[in-house]
Amino acid sequence: MIRRAPFLILLRFCRMGKMACSGYPPFQGRIVLSEMPAHRLAALIRSKEVSALEVAESFIDNIEASDSRICAFLYTDFSYTRDVARRVDEELKSATKLSPLAGVPIAVKDMILTRDMPTTAGSKILEGWIPPYNATVIERISRARMPILGKTNQDEFGMGSSTEYSAYKTTRNPWDLSRTAGGSGGGSSAAVSASQAPLALGTDTGGSIRLPAHCTGTVGIRPTYGSVSRYGVIALASSFDQVGPCSSNILDAALLHEVIAGYDPADAVSIKDQDLNFSQAAYEGANRGISGVRLGFVNPSNWCNSKITDLFGRTLKSLESEGAVLHEVQFPNFDHAVQAYYLIMQAEASSNLSRYDSIRFGPQEMAASASGTVSKTRSIRFGPEVKRRILLGTHILSAGYYDDFYMSAQKIRSLVKRDFAKIFSLVDVLLLPTAPTPAFKLGEKIDHHTSMYKSDTATTPASLAGLPAGSIPMGVIDGLPVGLQIIAPGQFDSRVYSTGAAIEQIIGDIHAMKNTKHNTGQTA
């Protein structure tokens, strides 16, 4: 196959119809396919200015060139990627009506079941396991004709905030290879940040989409709990788990969210009636701006470092100068949220992970008896962090401690929901820094578990309440990106997109501010 390496195309203009609204103007001049946002790639494919196969090859080239350094992927199947891309090109020739993201490649977190591709949840206990069916979200992106590039790295079973607890490799931050890409889903966000994929799927339990977005300068959205099917998603903590989009910008996340959202009878908590006009909300927000929007905020100075606190303050002033209405709100139980989350999450995880007995699926470590085989397999193939949380969760649920720990945490959860209800009676959305610090050095917190858990301070409240929340780039501190979190009322995901798109226009593209290491080739 002849490739137009590195897939440079000279374009005078792109006829992009709706995509060329004032908030999202078309590219002009010399472009690189792998550096284009998904909505523009989709428009080029539909207009036949480039083929879906050309787009796929550009990202395959990037993965092959950079993933030995980034370590975003655990598994790739480029033959499958190319087959789906060719199918899109053939269907375009026959004038078949396709989805808005047809032909746009996507990466998938390894927590999500993919038929005919390994799914390990980043754990040796599922090493080599190939599921017999697809998750609902995979069926939906398959129907949308989105070529899957591969499965992305993660902390084992989603337990971690740095992707250092993966049993296979440590994902590195494309902005600085010595730093974390966040977790648990650092692989998905790193792939988007490094232009290895225009879109990715992640899962968010307590911040596993939003924290990596913060660390890598990308967009990560946690949808309303129950709005995206969990069927076929490996369970960590069932009352928190949610699938969501990772992208380079708000509009792309909205388009992917529309593909994966919707009622699914296979998920007991799936919401039947949903407003799925997320891309329209993004268009309107980009065009209308932030004027008149009531933005709530909480003073982060007692849990954020001073540089992020200062940047957050400057961002609020900038938004106010554009017409936003600011309200400092009271959040009485904010400081208790992360503690309550970890108590409930570990209790649920200890129950969910009891199914991994090496008999039904996964490799076995043989012993003299069946019970011995189960015990030996779990002892050898679960990583230290997973075993730690299983033990803690079992302790939390044990007689004599259940009321003191688990039920007390559930009471805090109810209070957090009550706090949010009061906040949203006053404001349209709540703004917070996504995390207390920029991406930390790899190895810095791996043995300091409490410090690692505190990375989730700002992301766990929305998880406890089941609310939609997203992290978008807020700026750069010492050469590292930091995120701004937008939280909206339940089933008002469109507010995350409209507000995020408006703020995105004001803040601008932070990637031009990447540090010197990036520009001298020491990062991807």
From Swiss-Prot:
InterPro entries, alphabetized: Amidase, Amidase_CS, Amidase_dom, AS_sf, GatA
Annotated catalytic residues: 109, 184, 208
SUPFAM superfamilies in the cross-refs: Amidase signature (AS) enzymes
Pfam families for the chain: Amidase
Single annotated GO MF: glutaminyl-tRNA synthase (glutamine-hydrolyzing) activity
GO biological process: translation
Record keywords: ATP-binding, Ligase, Nucleotide-binding, Protein biosynthesis
Catalytic activity: L-glutamyl-tRNA(Gln) + L-glutamine + ATP + H2O = L-glutaminyl-tRNA(Gln) + L-glutamate + ADP + phosphate + H(+)
Function: Allows the formation of correctly charged Gln-tRNA(Gln) through the transamidation of misacylated Glu-tRNA(Gln) in organisms which lack glutaminyl-tRNA synthetase. The reaction takes place in the presence of glutamine and ATP through an activated gamma-phospho-Glu-tRNA(Gln).
Membership in a protein family: Belongs to the amidase family. GatA subfamily.
Protein name stated in the entry: Glutamyl-tRNA(Gln) amidotransferase subunit A
